[in-house]
Amino acid sequence: MLGLVLLYVGAVLFLNAVWLLGKISGREVAVINFLVGVLSACVAFYLIFSAAAGQGSLKAGALTLLFAFTYLWVAANQFLEVDGKGLGWFCLFVSLTACTVAIESFAGASGPFGLWNAVNWTVWALLWFCFFLLLGLSRSIQKPVAYLTLASAIFTAWLPGLLLLGQVLKA
């Protein structure tokens, strides 16, 4: 399931970057954010509530919900026409959570996938922190955040998702 989720996280991050660069409208980007938010939430609920759920899948589901809720909130903001400050502060919470996951991942990393996972969580922590600065504190960093979002889309989600789905990369 990781490959599936990462492929669509790559898509949503790519389109969010294009939106941040002013190339598409907020209402257009809401569609992919809603779709990926719902998809991620469904995967998270499966991981949490399936008959085979254990501590590992509970944790994976809880962390996946951080992504799902972020995308659903981005989608909602496009229709609520709010300034995004609440989402920005949520991004700070998620960034701090992602930092702890990154540290834990580096400490327990074994093999290429473990290292890749730790680096991903580090990049995601940085990305969410940048969204806190952009939205929560209204910093004028939209263009650099757009490019970081684009790089994150490609290297932490889209390409790894494709590699996992093609069974070139093993989780």
From Swiss-Prot:
Gene3D superfamilies: 1.25.40.600
InterPro entries reported in the protein's UniProt record: AmiSUreI_transpt (IPR003211), AmiSUreI_transpt_sf (IPR038523)
Chain segments annotated as transmembrane: 1-21, 29-49, 60-80, 87-107, 118-138, 145-165
Function: Possible transporter that might be responsible for the adsorption of amidase substrates or release of their hydrolysis products. AmiB and AmiS may act jointly in to a two component ABC transporter system.
Family, per entry: Belongs to the AmiS/UreI family.
Localisation: Cell membrane
Protein's UniProt name: Putative transporter protein AmiS
Membrane topology of the entry: Multi-pass membrane protein
Encoding gene (name): amiS
Keywords: Cell membrane, Membrane, Transmembrane, Transmembrane helix, Transport
Protein's organism: Pseudomonas aeruginosa (strain ATCC 15692 / DSM 22644 / CIP 104116 / JCM 14847 / LMG 12228 / 1C / PRS 101 / PAO1)
Domain of life: Bacteria
Record's keyword annotation contains Transmembrane: yes
GO cellular component: plasma membrane
Pfam families noted in UniProt: AmiS_UreI
CDD domains: UreI_AmiS_like_1 (cd13747)
Chief localization: membrane
